[in-house]
Amino acid sequence: MVYVGDNFVTVIGATWTPETARLLAAEIKEVTPKPITEVIDTNYHPDRAGGNAYFKSIGAKIISTKLTSDLLTKHWDEMVRYVQKGAPSYPTLPLVLPDKTFAGDFELQGGGVKAIYLGPSHTPDGIFVFFPQEKVLYGNCILKEQLGNLDFANLSEYPKTLERLKQLHLDFTTIVAGHWSPIHGPELIDEYLQLLATKTR
């Protein structure tokens, strides 16, 4: 996910590896000459933080919640090995921590990018990202059209986190899901709650 602001670009989710981050940066250059100055690690898993090293190398600041930074510190090597079990070609990446952390919710791009933490879900630390001007919610790995990988999910808290999201009454018309088909309407929240209910029965 990419947000092109007035003066610079914010990348939401650092991608899987330095190479995928480089490819994304090249695609961004085809859209805008504005520099990438901020990258949000939206959770501590490699698909959201694996490209940190590349983005740092081009001068971007890596940003996350303190919880994400703490989980990266504690579990990064373990998570790389976990990915390699399913994808043996995945590189052994060193830990690259965020440059700046927040205790909870935070805003970037003058309020155009709002990171929201509502509790455990797909991971203990996953955040939503809300773009109020565009009326778009990025669902991260938390919202998608299939249950997906729940190995690190808190199944008892996951529905509560989604209910808290609903209670915010954010003004969005589009949800960008973290995996599979990306574009959905607000109904994706209830659809995913129904999927979770089938898992927790």
Feature names for model-found ranges:
Residues 1-5:
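Mature N-terminal segment immediately following signal peptide/propeptide cleavage
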Residues 6-8, 19-63, 169-171:
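Active-site metal-binding motif and surrounding structural segment of the metallo-beta-lactamase
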Residues 8-10, 16-17, 70-192:
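Metallo-beta-lactamase
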Residues 20-21, 47-50, 71-73, 147-148, ...:
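Extracytoplasmic/secreted cell-surface and envelope-processing proteins
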Residues 22, 26, 30, 53, ...:
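Solvent-exposed, polar/charged alpha-helical surfaces in well-ordered, non-transmembrane soluble domains
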Residues 69-70, 195-199:
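Extracytoplasmic/periplasmic copper-protein system
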